[in-house]
Amino acid sequence: MRTRRRTAALAATLALAAAWAGSANATEKPEELVVQKMPPWHPHEIYIVDISMPSMTDGRIYVYDADAKKLLGQIDGGFGPGFAIAPDRKASVVATTYFSRGSHSTRTDVVEIIDNTTLDHAGEIVIPAKHAQHVPSPYNTAFSADGKRLYVANITPAASVTVIDAVSKKVLSEIDTAACVLAYPGDNDRFTALCESGKALTVTLDANGKEAKRTMSDAFIDVDKDPAFVNASRYKGDYLFTTYGGNVRSADFSGDKPAFGKPWSLLTDAERAEGWRPGGMQQTAVQAKQNRYYVLMHKGTDGSHKDPGTQVWVYDLKSKQRVARWDLTQQKVEPLVSIQVSEDDKPLFYGLTATSDLVVMDARTGALQHVEKQIGNTSSLLVNP
């Protein structure tokens, strides 16, 4: 009898062990990894470029949904990334540098192509190892209006621009820009670079992407008395350049010879005497549908042009008059270093603080909507496709 009981108990134990083992094996089955697709694009999707000063070989681009108030994903940026979104929004590019030993040894510069539906790496183009490595600018890496050409600014310290066929994904040429920097796209076959003299160099390309013609303008910026910020804002085909002293001048780079508008002031004499002036890293933004110009302002002196803005001044670009003045401290918002505005019927205003907080406000009223804490290490450029 005891033998039967022991046998039955042993059988039950073995059956239980087998069942447990089967269950364990079932739960430990490797999970199949999938890449989720991005939600459909909408105008309140903002890209945030971070050069990542504490670890500069590991720059990042973050994608944020301001309606859902959540981070959608990130793109690897490498060292000193230049970033641009194709006009059709289907892809982005990152012009960057990699070293074979992480932070040193053999250098390779590439333009990486990103599929915007997944944020996956979709290919790369090896470019001359001259890509300019500096605080991100919208004109370090830029598409032509039709998206068929891509311009990448180089500094070695000699200045040049690499011209790329974005369709065939091939380098077409490298244009010596004679100490003039960055690449402001004009018509589909030309770009303009800014010169230290305050002049503008426009290069016209032939059908093969080679230089066909170049034109140097007269100085439109007084670099000694009133230098201008290089991060100009686009408005109806023109570029709006704002100076350290608070003046604005439009530049039309669409033709083979640049044309410039008459300067106008952001400040009254009394405001200028009080020390108000523009500042920050990405100091201005345009909302073309409403003809609005947003400018970061602070009280400062000569040399304070990179100081963050404690206020946002809003101008009507038709009348060139200020229509609003937002004091950020009244909403307990930290000073902003960079700004951007969405281009839609219910526009949002975006700002970055010095600690990489993303501030979202109603672009029509200035009412605070949300603050997303610390997106990145040293984020400084906002791109709204």
Residue map of PLM features:
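Short glycine/acidic-enriched loop and turn motifs that connect beta-strands
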Residues: 52-56, 98-103, 157-158, 198-200, ...
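Repeated scaffold domains used in trafficking and secretory/extracellular systems
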Residues: 29-38, 77-88, 132-142, 177-188, ...
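Short loop/turn segments that connect beta-strands within beta-propeller blades
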Residues: 65-68, 116-118, 165-169, 205-208, ...
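Short, conserved, GDST-rich strand-edge loop motifs in beta-rich repeat architectures
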Residues: 40-53, 94-108, 295-309
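A short beta-strand motif characteristic of beta-propeller blades
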Residues: 28-33, 68-75, 79-81, 120-132, ...
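Asp-box/WD-like beta-propeller blade repeats and closely related beta-sheet repeat scaffolds
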Residues: 119-162, 166-184
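Short coil/turn segments that connect the beta-strands within blades of beta-propeller domains
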Residues: 43-45, 88-91, 146-148, 188-190, ...
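Loop/turn-rich, solvent-exposed surfaces of beta-rich toroidal or solenoidal domains
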Residues: 276-321, 325-345
